């Protein structure tokens, strides 16, 4: 059996043809073409024809000779506004849920919505508003207040209510005239997050409503196959890899693009002795996405946000500092630009390191010693990745860059701005997705997760 996998990115559309025999996958062909943002279908079908070396690939899919799976993060991906009650509890659970569904958080709100919040939502119009807050049987007034405020707003996006089940009927009555979906609470009680129903609802809305807005309805009509958000498929691949090979049970994957940096980790919620967890337990597999950390479109934002670290990095070469910022401004104006000399290659390395460092810092948990009535204890928020022994770099620059000192950039900041220890991997092997196959194998995992996971491990380069 042959499987074609296509991933439509913001800049490039990647396609691969795999031959499947039993539990083994063999790469037959692999092509890269520019994404036709004005008409995604045009570039998509061009990639299909190229990877299959035919003039018209559609008959091969229609008669069952070749299977097709594809994903997309083009045109900004899936933008979700997350709303919860307490920032470190229900709001954090809402953000984790949205990220696991392949979305990026466009905005987030806690407690009661005010006039400025509503104005911001109306102006940006996210694809979906994930409305959470309150455990089952818990706080009701904030959720009801926010429902009434939303009902009077001009917000026109899909709304998923995944909060306190005790007010589901009232929320339905208040927001019934909106595009409303009600699902199980993402946090029915403080010890048991429940993201699955909301995650599936986000995916369903992506397929029913957003595919057309992203210009993929033509592809669906002609192929009969529906796309998935690229980060969703990669998230599922991370789970499959963790399940298929014990030596890969726990690992971290960094997927860095021109505009964003995604971080995935598979890691158990373990606490070291004399450590207390603050907040909600995290899922075994977690994804975060940083919309301000990227190698091209977001380059200047990275440079401004990380000025202190930039100054430290160029302390021995102060003359290069102005040249570095000039280079970043050039990248923003010309996102397709590739470095032309050794200095610019070095600047790219520094920029990549800053993206990696900050994205992983925001993904990882933190720990700080506090004094209690029973003595000093470590207060931990989030996940402890210090025992993770494998880190993978993917995405255009990280896939190509060899060598890249991942160890240096993960330990560049041991403490965050609040003086808390950042719980990132310390001793690990660094692997590269050198051929950029992971997003493509993630699509294949929808057909055969076992074979896709094994092939993913085999294709990595130390």
What role is predicted for each listed range?
Residues 239, 246-319, 403-427:
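Glycine-rich phosphate-binding loop of actin/hexokinase-like ATP-binding domains
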Residues 304-369:
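A glycine- and small/hydrophobic-rich beta-loop-beta segment
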Residues 24-27, 286-288, 330-338, 416-422:
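Short acidic (Asp/Glu) and glycine-rich catalytic loops that position anionic groups and cofactors
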Residues 13-19, 80, 256, 261-266:
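Short beta-strand scaffold segments in enzyme catalytic cores
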Residues 1-5, 21-24, 28-38, 42-45, ...:
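Nucleotide/phosphate-binding catalytic cleft detector across ATP-hydrolyzing
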Residues 261, 265-268, 298, 361-368, ...:
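Hydrophobic alpha-helix feature that most strongly marks membrane-spanning transmembrane helices
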Residues 8-12:
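Short polar catalytic/cofactor-binding loops
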């Amino acid at each position: 059996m042959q499987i074609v996998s296509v991933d439509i990115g913001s800049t490039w559309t990647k396609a691969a043809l795999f031959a499947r025999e039993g539990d083994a996958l063999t790469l037959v062909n692999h092509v890269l073409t520019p994404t036709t943002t004005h008409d995604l279908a045009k570039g998509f079908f061009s990639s299909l024809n190229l990877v299959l070396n035919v003039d018209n690939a559609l008959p091969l899919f229609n008669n069952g000779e070749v299977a097709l799976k594809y994903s997309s993060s083009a045109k900004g991906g899936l933008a979700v506004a997350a709303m919860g009650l307490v920032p470190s509890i229900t709001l954090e659970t809402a953000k984790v849920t949205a990220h696991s569904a392949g979305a990026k958080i466009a905005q987030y709100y806690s407690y009661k919505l005010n006039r400025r919040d509503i104005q911001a939502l109306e102006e940006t119009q996210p694809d979906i508003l994930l409305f959470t807050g309150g455990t089952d049987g818990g706080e009701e007034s904030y959720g009801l207040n926010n429902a009434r405020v939303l009902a009077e707003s001009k917000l026109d996006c899909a709304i998923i209510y995944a909060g306190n089940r005790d007010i589901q009927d009232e929320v339905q009555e208040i927001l019934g005239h909106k595009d409303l979906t009600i699902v199980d609470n993402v946090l029915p009680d403080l010890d048991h997050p429940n993201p699955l129903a909301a995650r599936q609802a986000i995916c369903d809305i992506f397929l029913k409503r957003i595919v057309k807005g992203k210009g993929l309805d033509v592809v669906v009509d002609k192929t009969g196959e529906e796309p998935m958000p690229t980060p969703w498929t990669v998230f599922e691949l991370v789970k499959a890899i963790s399940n298929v090979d014990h030596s890969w049970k726990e690992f971290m994957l960094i997927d860095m693009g021109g505009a964003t940096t995604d971080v995935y980790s598979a890691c158990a919620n373990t606490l070291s002795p004399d450590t207390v967890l603050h907040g909600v337990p995290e899922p075994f597999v977690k994804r975060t996405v940083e919309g301000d950390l990227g190698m091209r479109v977001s380059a200047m934002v990275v440079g401004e946000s990380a000025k202190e670290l930039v100054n430290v990095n160029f302390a021995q070469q102060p003359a290069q500092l102005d040249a570095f910022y000039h280079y970043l401004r050039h990248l923003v104006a010309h996102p397709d630009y590739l470095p032309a000399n050794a200095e610019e290659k070095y600047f790219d390395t520094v920029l990549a390191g800053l993206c990696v460092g900050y994205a992983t810092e925001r993904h990882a948990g933190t720990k700080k010693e506090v004094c209690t009535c029973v003595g000093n204890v470590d207060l931990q928020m989030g996940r402890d990745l210090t025992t993770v022994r494998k880190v993978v770099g993917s995405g255009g620059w990280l896939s190509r860059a060899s060598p890249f000192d991942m160890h240096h950039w993960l330990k560049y900041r041991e403490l965050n701005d609040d003086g808390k220890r950042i719980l990132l991997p310390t001793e690990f092997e660094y692997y590269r997705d050198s051929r950029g196959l992971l997003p493509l194998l993630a699509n294949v995992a929808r057909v055969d997760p076992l074979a896709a996971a094994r092939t993913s491990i085999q294709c990595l380069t130390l």
